[in-house]
């Protein structure tokens, strides 16, 4: 009864006004699944291909009609009739049909849209919410949200070199309370920035994008806002950074060019800068502290901070088991950022999370800067019990949709629900 009878892809628009792929899947029993695919701004060179049309006369070349055509033709012809519950078979059928190592023929945006829509349809056929269908009876951990309240780098038009400054309400007792704490800090920060004559416009992910000249300036504002909101920095609320350092790495010169701060640093010097920041501020997590292929730099960072700070690989691992396996073997980083459009299918995403867990690496479920109202990552965060989620700030409805879904899941789980809280902190903290 879970045989796929129809697949329909279409072009819709994401939160940045760019086209993206949405897919509808219907099963023999009438069950239905719909998924919309996100898109990143700072993308790793090792990510699966996001297929764009390249026709500059339409959508600035960013149309996805080629990917949609693949969904409605080659992919549909191959998987209509297959059982939706056989996720591995469906994903592998699409991957083999594509025939490229990076999903470059159909696009990861086409394959992922179908993959997620199939899972949603199968969940409906079983009469289960998505988190329960994917995660089974063990799914019960609500993630600590890493809330992006100051944007820089590729996510904002300001001098700040680092891309994201996030707050993590680890002292909350529930996801509901964590959202409340985050919202209170967010509104306090807005008042503080406004009082200093700073811009309170928001960036792609809903964080403020003030014209600050350094990471320290942003961190000072955040720590002050946590305190003024009535919480203790380093106890109730910790801070996480996404440096997105591949974006300011000069490969030819092998230096990190922090233009906003007017500094050019070697890998070792940048690591020392992180050590300095972690000594001064309650930072528990740093994402992409070094460039995606700066393995020597990652080794230094892991040796100096790995025992007390979560070191997250985003561009480093791109949710790819081969990249992750290599990183584990090298002993670099200690956490995997999970973005399903980096790899392009649900089964491959879950395989990466399982590999991270087996190596005692943490996993952080993540959105992209170009999002939609689709809330799949909220369900997957609970399904995998990963304990942490990045889904933006406390404004912009495409971000809030995920928080609202997490609160619904928590309510549905009732007494079984467990908020990850302080368990996400490294032991040295």
UniProtKB/Swiss-Prot annotation:
Q: Does the keyword tRNA processing apply?
A: no
Name what cofactor the protein needs.
Mg(2+)
The protein's Enzyme Commission number: 4.2.1.11
Per UniProt, which keywords does this protein have? Cytoplasm, Glycolysis, Lyase, Magnesium, Metal-binding, Secreted
Catalysis performed (reactions): (2R)-2-phosphoglycerate = phosphoenolpyruvate + H2O
Write down the Gene3D superfamilies for this protein, in alphabetical order. Answer: Enolase-like C-terminal domain, Enolase-like, N-terminal domain
Query: Which GO biological process entries does UniProt record here?
Result: glycolytic process
Pathway listed for it is:
Carbohydrate degradation; glycolysis; pyruvate from D-glyceraldehyde 3-phosphate: step 4/5
Give the chief site where it resides: cytoplasm
The record, for CDD domains, names: enolase (cd03313)
Q: Does the keyword Transferase apply?
A: no
Q: Which domain of life is it from?
A: Bacteria
Q: What class of enzyme is it?
A: lyase
Q: Where does (2R)-2-phosphoglycerate bind?
A: 163, 339, 368-369, 390
TM ranges: none
Known partners and oligomeric status: Homooctamer.
Per its database record, what is this protein's job? Catalyzes the reversible conversion of 2-phosphoglycerate (2-PG) into phosphoenolpyruvate (PEP). It is essential for the degradation of carbohydrates via glycolysis.
Protein's name according to its UniProt entry: Enolase
Organism whose genome encodes this protein: Zymomonas mobilis subsp. mobilis (strain ATCC 31821 / ZM4 / CP4)
